[in-house]
Amino acid sequence: MKNLDKILIKFLILSLILFVFSLFFSKKGKNTPKAIDSAILNPRHSSEISQIEINVPYQEDGSIIFKKQGDFWLLEKDLPSGEKIISQADSSIIESFIKKTSEIRKLYKVSDTSSDYESFSVSENSGITVLFLGNNNKLYTKVHFGHSDSLKNRIYFRSEASKITYECENDFQQYLTAETNYWSEGKIIPEIKNPVQISFKINEGLVGQPPKATTLDENSSSFSTKSNTLLSLRHGKIWPETTINSADYISTLSVQDGSGRLAKLDFFKIQKGDDESYFYRKSIQPSPVDSQENTFAFYSEKAAYEISAWTYEKIIQTILSAE
């Protein structure tokens, strides 16, 4: 009889433990966000995007706009000083951003009330806002991205058209910035692909007895190597054009491709004591086959590009070297 009592007691204890566990997991399951398969940007519209705006409210100059013009993407940046920078953006980064946001992914609903916006940082004033637009400023979606959870590698967001806040895998955090240097095309002459002629002229007013203007073409020694070296060089920080208003003009580099498109870079130097800073201003002459959109992109550029002393010397050495 005693053995039977012991068995019954053990059975009751085991049943109680199983009951408690069932309550715990049932409650946990109810609190687990339900996932849906969707995308931040409707994939049907990804090929129609021609303008993107990013606003970062906690940055002084945290606003940047990208506009598709022909074969290029332009970035526009309004500075606190009232000046504007217009430069060529890195098309590969922008296309990657569009692709990422239009991928079907798991979205987890975490809230459906506006009172939770601030806690997830997805309000108009606390979140990073991204607008995807098409032609004629047609708005496809406006998204507010909130804070991220590094442990789960997720980020909170909501669409302007909905009160629902979701979280999803945070595999596009690098794109949520208004930093000009991140988005800009880093190469000094991205508009030229296959050069057929290169010329370089030094300002005679600054250099005593300089060499005459040097011109290289496809028949010149090591032309392919030299042109590839020039096209691989990259610039540094982008500044407003007024930065070089008081700078000394020192030289001009011109590079033309087979279509007749011509890129001209005017170089400037700013001397402050022992410190030297180098900049260039770029202008592009379109070819006869360039579209009106490409031409507009070329003529819209408004910026001064900083380069290192090493980069400037590399340009000179590359062009003037015998081999």
Residue ranges of model-derived segments:
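Secondary-structure "cap/kink" motif recognition
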Residues: 1-323
